[in-house]
Design a protein with these regions (language model features):
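A positively charged, amphipathic N-terminal helix/segment that binds anionic biomolecules
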Residues: 1-136, 144-227, 231-252, 256-263, ...
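Catalytic-site neighborhood detector that most strongly recognizes the C-terminal catalytic loop/helix
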Residues: 273-287
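The DNA-contacting recognition helix of HTH DNA-binding domains
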Residues: 266-267, 277
């Protein structure tokens, strides 16, 4: 049964079921326990196994509040898929290393994008996000987001949720690629990752590239960030243990902080949505 929330956080809320106001205090308290953001407008409460409610933010963008149990199950599936795909990622790294020298413009551009996901922690991005949120990702990166400094390139843009993404790229092949593209660009507002007659690389193009390498499991650009987060976490943790082998909890926390910074995320989002809890649990056992 759908319930509609009317009002705002300043004047208070009323709840309606079939256009009849809910006045039972117990029912109202149950709704409040769902913790639906007060800033959302036109809220519809579903409270199903998948979705608790949806509403619209200040920019009239639809926002969905998912059931925590659904998210937990999806995370289990996500981490299992990642842990079962070690051969895929090994194969992918070899392919993109080769494709950075590919003469096909499209394939080479995709290889550069995937390399930057791994080395700089950037999101893939898309034109819809750019238009609606004024946020940039790799497929919507423009020359104005690059700063050439000696043998390195600084990539600087505003990404998802208004977070500034800032990272240096010191990969020689990628720097050569970006330098050459920049020299022939007609404007700093041009998209970098284009091919042919100004065709722009999209997230779908990158996912199709990944699909060619996959066997049965479909790996997407989102999975690349998850895999990268866990590999970075393990690497950072090992380095921290060399200098401090007394406090595992402290090193786990610090390693997650380092991953969050690399991925341009908050600590809580990184821990909740990117790092496999089984990896953390297994590490924590060896005190």
């Amino acid at each position: 049964m759908k319930i509609n929330r009317v009002g705002n956080y300043k004047t208070g809320f009323k709840y309606y079921k079939n256009k009849v106001e809910i006045t039972n205090n117990d029912e109202i308290e149950k709704i409040k326990l769902l913790k639906i953001p007060p800033a959302y407008d036109n809220v519809t409460i579903i409270n199903s196994k998948k979705v608790i409610a949806y509403g619209y933010d200040s920019k009239n963008r639809k926002q969905v509040l998912y059931n925590p149990n659904f998210i937990a199950k999806q995370n289990i599936i996500k981490y299992k898929k990642i842990s079962n795909s070690i051969k895929f990622f090994s194969k992918l790294k070899k392919k993109i290393a080769n494709d950075l020298s590919n003469t096909d413009e499209k394939i080479k551009a995709i290889a550069v994008i995937i390399t930057l996901i791994f080395t700089c922690g950037f999101r893939i991005g898309n034109k819809k996000y750019e238009k609606e949120n004024n946020s940039v990702g790799l497929t919507t990166l423009k020359y104005k987001h690059l700063k050439f400094e000696n043998n390195k390139i600084l990539i600087d843009f505003i990404g998802k949720k208004g977070v500034r993404n800032l990272a240096y790229c010191d990969n020689k092949k990628i720097n050569e690629y970006l330098n050459n593209k920049h020299k022939i660009a007609s404007s700093n507002d041009d998209y970098i990752f284009s091919y042919g007659a100004n065709k722009i690389i999209t997230s779908n193009d990158v996912n199709e590239y990944l699909k060619m390498i996959c066997n049965n499991t479909i790996i997407t650009t989102k999975d690349l960030r998850t895999w990268n987060a866990n590999m970075l976490f393990i690497s950072y943790f090992k380095k921290l243990r060399i200098s401090d082998n007394t406090n595992i909890e402290k090193d786990i926390k610090k390693a997650i902080e380092m991953v969050a910074k690399k991925l341009h995320n908050s600590y809580s989002i990184c821990k909740k949505s990117y790092i496999d809890p089984d990896i953390i649990a297994n590490i924590a056992k060896y005190k």
